[in-house]
Amino acid sequence: MEERNPTHDTEGRLGTVEAKVRKIVESLGEDVGYQFCNWAQANVALDDVEKPTIIYVLPPSGSFHFKWNEVLDRPNAQIAFVSPTDFDFDGTENDGIVEAMKRLCIRFVRAVNESGYFSELEDDIPYQVLYDHLDHNVTGVVISPTLVEEAGVNLCNEPERLEDD
């Protein structure tokens, strides 16, 4: 998986929430795919998915938490756990895929909690079952947690300014 934002993510420091999520997904192994996109892009990208995939959907909103020395990003995330299925799927087979994606979600949440990148996800995390929502035949679950960074942008240093060339 390539770096998505080299301006803010470096070898020594992951400066974006997306890079932290990507790193967590990478820790789950090569048998899990990863996509970072909006739902329209995911609809196209899923045409080529052949293995269970975690989709970090471009967050629609969030909040900043300002402290005396740093700012923490708290995006309202949508994270989908999907796997390909047949067009005319059997209910029992599809239920097995849903259950497998729930287990992948549990692995992901455990990895988030062990990563130290975000506050622990605990208590109730509602999910929605996903099938027949996209053009490609995938089944899975979607969660919508608020990811709270443990380390954010340092306010003691001058924030980098992006300028046009």
Task: Enumerate the language-model features and the residues they cover.
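Charged, amphipathic alpha-helical segments and their flanking helix caps
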Residues: 1-39, 60-165
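Short N-terminal edge-element motif at the start of the domain
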Residues: 43-46
